[in-house]
Amino acid sequence: MRPLPGAPGVAAAAALLLLLLPRARSDEHEHTYQDKEEVVLWMNTVGPYHNRQETYKYFSLPFCVGSKKSISHYHETLGEALQGVELEFSGLDIKFKDDVMPGTYCEIDLDKEKRDAFVYAIKNHYWYQMYIDDLPIWGIVGEADENGEDYYLWTYKKLEIGFNGNRIVDVNLTSEGKVKLVPNTKIQMSYSVKWKKSDVKFEDRFDKYLDPSFFQHRIHWFSIFNSFMMVIFLVGLVSMILMRTLRKDYARYSKEEEMDDMDRDLGDEYGWKQVHGDVFRPSSHPLIFSSLIGSGCQIFAVSLIVIIVAMIEDLYTERGSMLSTAIFVYAATSPVNGYFGGSLYARQGGRRWIKQMFIGAFLIPAMVCGTAFFINFIAIYYHASRAIPFGTMVAVCCICFFVILPLNLVGTILGRNLSGQPNFPCRVNAVPRPIPEKKWFMEPAVIVCLGGILPFGSIFIEMYFIFTSFWAYKIYYVYGFMMLVLVILCIVTVCVTIVCTYFLLNAEDYRWQWTSFLSAASTAIYVYMYSFYYYFFKTKMYGLFQTSFYFGYMAVFSTALGIMCGAIGYMGTSAFVRKIYTNVKID
């Protein structure tokens, strides 16, 4: 039997996407245990408290490991590998429901080099993270005395593990045994395990890590209410102004239709009707413009789907699951990019559709991978756990070439064939109409700069909560708020760009495509400016790696947000422009 065309590529794509999905392995992933069954304590990373993303392998500090036989851990998902999860076996002997009395599990032979490493870690407030049954545990490395002359290491890990039936539902760590760091001495590391019955349900075991008092604060509710009221006011204002203004315009244009040619020539003709022969003229640089619109539509689809999935599933309970889900959804929604970008490029008369398809497919991945590649050099120099392994890079490249590109090609072909024919309500003139002079505040550059203020105002409070959950130590879980804010952002963006475009066309300037896109996309400029304020006034980050990581990925986030807002603004404005020129009689 002859194999189907493209079958090897489909098989390779399926295998690559399986990397994004968690693999089942042992009872740790079933989250059920038998009495006396082994429970693994994984050591993850260690790093400065104020630099959340600057993390290193736990055993990069001269900690000792327990005597139990080592267990290897592999990255279960692509999200884990990209987020720098580096689980290493602690060597501690822990069994389900089996208490362990205080005892030594290893000994550190503290020479001067090891002492200096611990002192540096304590000076920089290093903390470490561990996992038991996918439940995170945090601890501090040590502390200094009031004078900052003597340094102490916490040597005793006191674990209290709560269980409900055959499941682990709670883990607490108490650090004790403060020992002064003195060169050429031996430090004994010890631990104990106490099991206790708990009434906490397995489904609710992550509730203790959430912070309702922070995310459901009155300010958060007030900001949502304030943004919602702004939407109602803005929609009402835009509707009233445009309906009244357009009604007058239609009446004036109808009156002009009743005039004879002499009266019409002597009349004072002005307004958006005068550019009917140029308003549907292709935008400048249609290849780039179409690719941006397609990418923006895909980012919106990804945002919408991921938020819905996060509302249904508690993605924060699994390491790297949010990032893995986002990558999977981005790859799966590639036809959206191809469809909207390819159809728009075809309607604008573009002929290099293959080049447009490639640019649309790789625009966002190239931006993200380029930034990650730059930061990866710094991470490698720092020997940080955030350094992306070579195998992970290869996997990401394969996803781009064997999943995203073919799906984008499918979307492009569908877009060109289903909605690629121009169907404008007005005929485009052969010769472009000269653009008259206008007041300075009607210039496209000014409109672009001002267009992002209101959309940013509708989301900047939510930006604080999102930033805090990513750059600080909060778990974002109120995705219902995020969905509402996304809807508000879309409505405000469309309303603002429609008003901006109306005034631009009324000034007889038909360059509305890029203006509508950029005026909506300028929201990204204000978000990035806000990230500077957040960095300097809301965090205590320091160092080259953390600073590069912060501003690098904030630039990626802001750019992606801007492309999404620009696409939303253009799509809404395009429908508006088509509507008003459909309803007016053109000779």
UniProtKB/Swiss-Prot annotation:
Pfam family name, one: EMP70
Any single GO CC term annotated in Swiss-Prot or TrEMBL for this entry: membrane
InterPro entries in the record: EMP70 (IPR004240)
Family under the similarity heading: Belongs to the nonaspanin (TM9SF) (TC 9.A.2) family.
Keyword presence, Metal-binding: no
Organism: Mus musculus
Residue positions the entry lists as glycosylated: N172, N417
Domain of life per record: Eukaryota
Key words of the record: Glycoprotein, Membrane, Signal, Transmembrane, Transmembrane helix
Keyword Transport: no
Transmembrane segments annotated in the record for this chain: 222-242, 292-312, 326-346, 358-378, 387-407, 447-467, 480-500, 517-537, 549-569
Signal peptide: 1-26
Ranges in coiled-coil conformation: none
Subcellular location: Membrane
Protein name: Transmembrane 9 superfamily member 3
PANTHER family per record: TRANSMEMBRANE 9 SUPERFAMILY MEMBER 3 (PTHR10766:SF41), TRANSMEMBRANE 9 SUPERFAMILY PROTEIN (PTHR10766)
Membrane-topology descriptor: Multi-pass membrane protein
